[in-house]
Amino acid sequence: DGCFIAASAPNPSRWGILQSIDDNNHQKADIRMHENDFFNEDLLCALAGVAGEDNVLMSEPMREHTTFKIGGPADVFVTPDTEQGLVATLDTCYRCDLPLTIVGNGSDLLVGDKGIRGVVVALGKGLSDITVDGTHVTAAAGALLSDVAAAAAEAGLTGMEPISGIPGSVGGACYMNAGAYGA
């Protein structure tokens, strides 16, 4: 019995289909999944197949992933460590019509005691590349703002100092229009 590693588009009734693929890439079976049935072991196996086995957790306490240290469990918590893993994880969630929440560093993120239903995708260390080329700084969504400011300073660039004290990530800062200390 192999993992379920492929997904096909959901039909209009909000059902998704996971396809079971054996070790020789032959389709074995289709598993129908409804939007409320995402605790299925086959789905966890599918997500592990695209994001990495160690990167998929069930009932993960969100308090471990927020700067306020509060929050109940995420039904499924995924931390893809490559861009390809992220794209494949999002594709699987969309194709199976799963509830999806994307988080960064968890700064200013308030999660209730009941947690987050569905799949939480966290952009972290594997998606935090920072490159400096002359006067241009390029940073991935999971890069911490403090690390971006430090990389700019190390390259002799100025202007990023105000973000060094913000505990967020680039993706979260862009999405939420973060700012503090004149940033």
Regions found by a protein language model. Name each.
Residues 62-100, 112-157:
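N-terminal glycine-rich flavin-associated loop
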Residues 29, 33-84, 117:
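N-terminal flexible segment immediately upstream of the FAD-binding catalytic core
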Residues 149-155, 159-183:
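A gly/ser-rich beta-alpha-beta helix-loop segment of oxidoreductase catalytic cores
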